[in-house]
Amino acid sequence: MKTRQNKYSIRKFSVGASSILIAALLFMGGGSAQAAEQQQDKGTVENSTTQSIGDENEKLSEQQSTQNKNVNEKSNVDSITENESLHNETPKNEDLIQQQKDSQNDNKSESVVEQNKENEAFVKKHSEEKPQQEQVELEKHASENNQTLHSKAAQSNEDVKTKPSQLDNTTAQQEDSQKENLSKQDTQSSKTTDLLRATGQNQSKDSQSTEEVNKEVKNDTQQVTAKNDDDKVETFNLNSKEEPLKVDKQANPTTDKDKSSKNDKGSHDGLANLESNAVATTNKQSKQQVSEKNEDQTNKSAKQKQYKNNDPIILVHGFNGFTDDINPSVLTHYWGGDKMNIRQDLEENGYEAYEASISAFGSNYDRAVELYYYIKGGRVDYGAAHAAKYGHERYGKTYEGVYKDWKPGQKIHLVGHSMGGQTIRQLEELLRHGNPEEVEYQKQHGGEISPLFQGGHDNMVSSITTLGTPHNGTHASDLLGNEAIVRQLAYDVGKMYGNKDSRVDFGLEHWGLKQKPNESYIQYVKRVQNSKLWKSKDSGLHDLTRDGATDLNRKTSLNPNIVYKTYTGESTHKTLAGKQKADLNMFLPFTITGNLIGKAKEKEWRENDGLVSVISSQHPFNQKYVEATDKNQKGVWQVTPTKHDWDHVDFVGQDSTDTKRTRDELQQFWHGLADDLVQSEQLTSTNK
């Protein structure tokens, strides 16, 4: 509704002292009148907002209530019926009627009424503080009779419709009474001159103090109202749960009710002025609590993650890799070392990522099965046929699952470092084609079979990325990995850390390399010594050899719907004899293997990163590859340029002594990798 222009006529008011109020209203600003009009429209909803104003107005109102409480009592009783018919004529008449009816309830004695009436008449006519006194009166009436306002307004509207003739009669009476009372005011003014001198100074100070407080409260109220106008729906919903009767919650329904008045600055300021002058009945901290609560809830909403990648990134560690909760104390954090936490940094920069926790020394097959259950959740089932073939237990640990809804159409990015690159290739092969041996075994022997071994689960992997992965094996494992001394070392380590009091988990419990609760240490050592693991090909030591890698290459294939990419490093230099020698900044434990690989008979295998030859890390020999460009491709290995002076652990930041490879460089590398994965989703998302 549009705000109506307020018009005043001396002929429209009743007899008695009501004319005194009319004279006072003429001194009041248009803003207060408009505020009263909107207050009438808003009803009890808007009146409730006055309860959140400060303690200062309450004290000032109590000081002045004894002087302004019962103004115009006698005349109000005589003219209340006529004034009701004028309720909807002008906003000023509405305020007058309400003041007349409200004051009727507070009439204590006729003598007090007469005295206060005389005092107030003189003050309204001659004092410069009349507007402030009238505002205080409005404050009191608004707080005491806000519940009866609507019912009286409805009654007055009905009277206007049914008795239009009362308007003319009342107008005539008001004109006569106005003339009579103007003369009466002159005679009464002399009686109150002395009283004014005694009280005028105090009233002036009180009014000035009231004005300053009202300005401050008004500004606070306008700020709260303006804030809720911008977020009216959201703020209302938040406050409705825990703050049922506060300023923020009241402002929004009112705004919805009268949208045009929100855009009217004059009306808005008038309403704020009325609220600021209302009697405060609660602690003024309530408004501050509402604001603080809204701010906290907004911040909580802003913290909700919107990841850049649609498909989660799964980081898969390599041989002798651990997560922090199960690693030996001598080892550093796998993904980032002392430089940074790669997964956490990706998360903080908008990429959803997880660190897989699988066997440190297990075979690619066993690790792939564990990786499936790490993502999907559930108890690891290595398969009945596989367990019978290699002589270990069928079931392993139970995973909670980081992506329980993982299924065809719900894809993931697999990123593997070192042996982890082989493991993720094995997993993707099982998803698509399953394990025919397990299917046949189940047909013959019955029982359950894992969905992983049944195959037919294509369209679950978006990309496969490998970092320093020995796709074709490594001379390090050929020459050292299967030597008796190396196996003995692995046996001793497993024996030491496999006791029941150790938190270290090598992921070989299904092989028996974990002390049982009721088993003595001597019994445990004998069992570990007799384990078939040390002679089995179902282990990481075998799969890292060139023969083991070749076997994996024959069993796996490229998926035409997956983006493949490899990253390779080297940290050796050529000698005069044509060999490759480890660089000075190579990770110290790898200098032995780096120099050993650098002396290989095959010249093309000599350049290496300390553990893996460059030629083995680029792509499987039997699978198609291209040089990587800015444009991603599916179904082919995309080989990125070799990173010089990068050894095997520089991709994961484990060498804290290498000053050439900085934290910023590592962070930049991973941000670029993650961004490339997001771009690859444009190619693979069409298959969802």
From Swiss-Prot:
EC numbers: 3.1.1.3
One of the record's GO molecular function terms: metal ion binding
Major subcellular site: secreted
Membrane-traversing stretches: none
Enzyme active site: 418 (nucleophile), 609 (charge relay system), 648 (charge relay system)
Domain of life: Bacteria
Signal sequence region: 1-35
Skewed-composition ranges (Basic and acidic residues): 84-95, 103-143, 227-268
Residue ranges annotated as propeptide in the record: 36-302
Chain sites annotated for binding Ca(2+): 647, 650, 655, 658
Location(s), subcellular: Secreted
Keywords for this protein: Calcium, Hydrolase, Lipid degradation, Lipid metabolism, Metal-binding, Secreted, Signal, Zymogen
Reactions catalysed: a triacylglycerol + H2O = a diacylglycerol + a fatty acid + H(+)
Stated family: Belongs to the AB hydrolase superfamily. Lipase family.
Annotated protein name in UniProt: Lipase
UniProt source species: Staphylococcus epidermidis (strain ATCC 35984 / DSM 28319 / BCRC 17069 / CCUG 31568 / BM 3577 / RP62A)
Primary gene name: lip
